[in-house]
Design a protein with these regions (language model features):
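Intrinsically disordered, low-complexity, charged terminal extensions of DNA damage-control enzymes
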Residues: 1-27, 32-33, 190-309
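Catalytic cores of DNA base-excision repair glycosylases
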Residues: 7-202, 208-219, 282-285
Length: 309
């Protein structure tokens, strides 16, 4: 394909997506009703590694308590954690809180509008910065979240087990329209979320299926190539449940680094014997029993948890 033909294909891709978005894209998400940088930012952080349907009630609750950066910046981090409970990946909540302090102190409570300023906020990478700039400011920046990756891999029939982010970023930037970037960015994310899904893509309803290489060569169920699963490390945790008067529980705050950083948990020890030693130290009888044993899977780690009482 000549460079001229390729440019025409890229223009058609963005043009068709923008037209499709008007009639078939998602328009009723809560962060779309009042589009401003703050709401887009919070939604994009919440949507990192989390599905839209899970995020919806948390976003509404968050906005009710913290409707703007000023309200968030005046809060306590413990209150933000409490509001985040159940959404997971608590580092995101910490980064949101830290960012609100930076925006208050360095930007006079006005959300920054340049790529350099936004990407330097805690918890914001290249794709999240691009999403904020395109969706909230209508600036010409590319995004590359999971949905967009899948659309591009299928459209260009990229069969690769290795990391191909560099190649995908090039495609993502080349496909950008000259204007209406806010509509285009929402469109390509919606396409991946509703049409070009992981399983059973609905190709007959896809606005760019005519030039889709995977559809042409019958590869839609093969691409994206399944990457090798990462073997999770295992870690043992021993929690001690100390209860007073049936309704008071002894807790400790986790360090600022590691699993569940800065969150409150039961007392945590390396071994069962360490639990007993601690009880002796605080003049309590070291008679404990295994109250519960559970396994908990994190993205990168498998936890074997023993709870003693």
């Amino acid at each position: 394909m000549s460079g001229k033909d390729q440019n025409k294909e890229y223009r058609n891709f963005s043009k068709n997506l923008i037209l499709w978005q008007k009639d078939f894209g998602r328009h009723n998400l809560p962060w779309q009703k009042q589009t401003n940088p703050y709401r887009v930012w919070i939604s994009e952080i919440m949507l990192q590694q989390t599905q839209v349907k899970t995020v919806l009630p948390f976003f509404e609750k968050f906005m009710k308590k913290y409707p703007d950066i000023k309200a968030l910046s005046k809060s306590k981090i413990e209150d933000v954690f409490e509001l985040w409970t159940g959404l997971g990946y608590y580092r995101r909540a910490e980064n949101i809180y830290k960012s609100s302090q930076i925006i208050r102190n360095k930007h006079n409570l006005i959300f920054p509008s340049t790529f350099e300023e936004i990407i330097n906020l805690p918890g914001i990478g290249r794709s999240t910065a691009g999403a904020i700039l395109s969706l909230a400011f209508n600036k010409r920046y590319a995004i590359l979240d999971g949905n967009v990756k899948r659309v591009l891999e299928r459209y260009f029939a990229i069969k690769a087990e290795k990391n191909i982010d560099k190649e995908l970023w090039e495609f993502s930037e080349n496909l950008l329209p000259k204007d209406k970037n806010n509509i285009y960015s929402q469109a390509i994310m919606d396409l991946g979320a509703t049409i070009c899904t992981k399983k059973t893509p609905v190709c007959e309803k896809c606005p760019v299926s005519l030039d889709c290489k995977s559809l042409k060569f019958d590869l839609t169920n093969v691409i994206p190539i399944k990457r090798k699963k990462i073997i999770k490390k295992e870690k043992d945790l021993n929690y001690l449940l100390v209860v007073k008067n049936k309704n008071l529980v002894l807790m400790q705050k986790n360090p600022s680094k590691g699993i569940w950083a800065n969150l409150w948990t039961f007392l945590n020890f390396k071994t069962r014997d360490d639990c007993k030693k601690y009880l002796k130290k605080i003049n309590l009888t070291p008679n404990i029993y295994n109250y519960a044993s559970i396994q908990h899977n994190l993205t990168h780690m498998k936890l074997n948890i023993n709870i003693y009482r």
